[in-house]
């Protein structure tokens, strides 16, 4: 599931003698804290314990762990839903700097639909498929985040592996932003284990065009380095973007072996900054990535 918009993780520390709680972003640092927003809705699905909080025009979709920790999956400004509030989601859009010509894209993991809202605004001609395994997430995204299918966007309730095994038109970009409540079927960050194998990466490659790109939202955990090595072994070229002061790394895996020089990326980023309506600076993303 999206993380998107995805992917922030917050740990809610509750103590008997502590009045209040600290909320830590999934992809944030231990120093991040914010006042808890009121709970607006709560539901359990077959995959996750889902909670929605709202503060004025900002609505947040969270997963709740077994010990009560809250994990932010999406955050939307209801007045301007196309604005990406979570930093990691902006870094995922560096895909446009690496592969500027995008006609078809796939998002694995819906969450609250932040990426859907952004791409409708930023690239309205883009043909977009979104695969989400949890039907409750799809319903919640519709009812609370106005994230639903339209003429250029399909939302498919299916496991991503099964979807990608089917025949279909190739994608220019695939965004991997799938997270569930942590379980024996996921890694420590909530990524389904069957979406991390060498076999899965081969299936993904088969659904890309020859110059296609896969963008992974990775959370730093005990096997983080192994995750990057597995992606590096499967794809001809990778680009890494560490999100400043956060616990996540965006890895863009390209089918094109030749490396794009930093000067080329910077030039493309400057062109997007001048001509697009992203609401953030692509050059700033490249400059601040670590």
Predicted regions, residues:
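A SAM-dependent methyltransferase catalytic signature shared across enzymes that methylate proteins
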Residues: 213, 227-241, 255-259
């Amino acid at each position: 599931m999206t993380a998107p918009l995805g992917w922030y993780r917050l740990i809610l520390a509750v103590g008997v003698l502590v009045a209040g709680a600290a909320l830590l972003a999934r992809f944030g640092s231990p120093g991040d804290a914010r006042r808890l927003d009121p709970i607006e809705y709560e539901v359990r699905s077959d995959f996750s314990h889902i909670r929605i909080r709202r503060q004025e025009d900002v609505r947040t979709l969270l997963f709740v762990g077994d010990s009560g920790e809250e994990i932010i999956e999406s955050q939307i400004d209801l007045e301007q839903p196309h604005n990406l509030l979570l930093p990691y989601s902006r870094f995922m859009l560096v895909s446009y700097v690496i592969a500027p010509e995008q006609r078809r894209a796939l998002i694995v993991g819906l969450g609250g639909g932040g990426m859907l809202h952004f791409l409708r605004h930023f690239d309205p001609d883009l043909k977009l498929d979104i695969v989400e395994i949890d039907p409750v997430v799809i319903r919640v995204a519709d009812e609370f985040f106005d994230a639903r299918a339209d003429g250029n966007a399909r939302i498919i309730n299916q496991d991503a592996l099964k979807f990608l095994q089917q025949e279909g038109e190739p994608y220019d970009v695939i965004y991997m932003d799938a997270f569930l409540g942590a379980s024996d079927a996921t890694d420590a960050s909530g990524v389904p284990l069957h979406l991390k194998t060498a076999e899965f990466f081969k299936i993904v490659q088969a659904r890309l065009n020859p110059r296609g790109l896969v963008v992974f939202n990775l959370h730093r955990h005990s096997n983080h380095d192994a995750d990057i090595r597995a992606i590096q072994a499967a794809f001809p070229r990778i680009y890494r973007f560490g999100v400043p002061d956060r616990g996540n790394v965006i890895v863009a895996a390209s089918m094109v072996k030749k490396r794009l020089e930093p000067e080329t990326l910077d030039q493309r980023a400057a062109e997007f900054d001048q001509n697009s309506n992203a609401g953030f600076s692509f050059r700033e993303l490249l400059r601040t990535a670590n």
